[in-house]
């Protein structure tokens, strides 16, 4: 199934390549976005986090980055010595991260989920943990993390009914993805039920609420901090 998935991903990439080239010519900053998305991250862009046991937190766009902000603040407060990497997919998400997450040691565009790209980026960064926000689970990236025994914790997890139907088509891959995640921190009991029905281990599922509404960046309890520290090693 991975072969079929990768053939589809590579085919889709070449189909949209002319559009990417056009945007690179016409849109300021898009060349950097594509360079990083294809794994061409410069050493100086990740020197503060690469091979230093960083915490890698990923949010696709503006909404996910807003949800990421209070989490980053609490991690920085609890573990100031650990570098933090934040990644985003969209230009809006990237710009928002630079505006509201000054605590991050590095901010990059997320690598495309092509096997050679994911493998290269994970090998260069080697985070201590990867924390995708909401439903940002990508097969090749998770596979590269799993092969290096790097834990994955989903935060602010959200699964829609439409997503449930879509993920069921990823048989042979979806089970691997779920088994790679060591903890599912879901927004609601409904989201928890969805991820459970999709095959996640119930003992790994927690309902933690939606961090997007955590506007005051409330203090976490000592028990929460101890659990985070244990999970992060």
Annotated model-derived regions:
Residues 1-8, 12-22:
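Membrane-interacting alpha-helical segments
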Residues 17-220, 227:
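Active-site and donor-binding regions of nucleotide-sugar-utilizing enzymes
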Residues 229-233:
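Short, intrinsically disordered, charge-balanced linker/junction segments flanking boundaries
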């Amino acid at each position: 199934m991975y072969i079929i998935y990768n053939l589809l991903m590579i085919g889709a990439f070449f189909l949209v390549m002319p559009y990417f080239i056009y945007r690179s010519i016409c849109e300021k900053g898009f060349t950097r976005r594509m360079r990083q998305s294809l794994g061409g991250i410069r050493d100086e862009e990740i020197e503060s986090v690469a091979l230093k046991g960083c915490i890698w937190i990923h949010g696709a766009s503006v909404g996910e980055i807003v949800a990421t902000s209070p989490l980053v603040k609490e991690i920085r407060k609890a573990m100031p010595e650990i570098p933090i990497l934040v990644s985003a997919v969209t230009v809006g998400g990237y710009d928002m991260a630079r505006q509201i997450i000054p605590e991050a040691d590095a901010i990059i565009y997320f690598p495309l989920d092509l096997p050679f790209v994911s493998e290269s980026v994970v090998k260069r960064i080697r985070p201590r943990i990867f924390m995708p926000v909401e439903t940002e689970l990508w097969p090749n990236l998770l596979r590269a993390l799993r092969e290096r025994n790097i834990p994955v914790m989903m935060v602010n997890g959200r699964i829609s009914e439409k997503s449930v139907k879509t993920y069921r088509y990823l048989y042979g891959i979806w089970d691997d993805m779920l088994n790679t995640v060591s903890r599912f921190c879901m927004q609601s009991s409904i989201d928890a039920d969805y991820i459970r029905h999709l095959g996640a281990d119930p003992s790994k599922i927690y309902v933690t609420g939606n961090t997007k509404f955590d506007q005051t960046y409330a203090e976490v309890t000592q028990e929460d901090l101890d659990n985070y520290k244990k999970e992060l090693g």
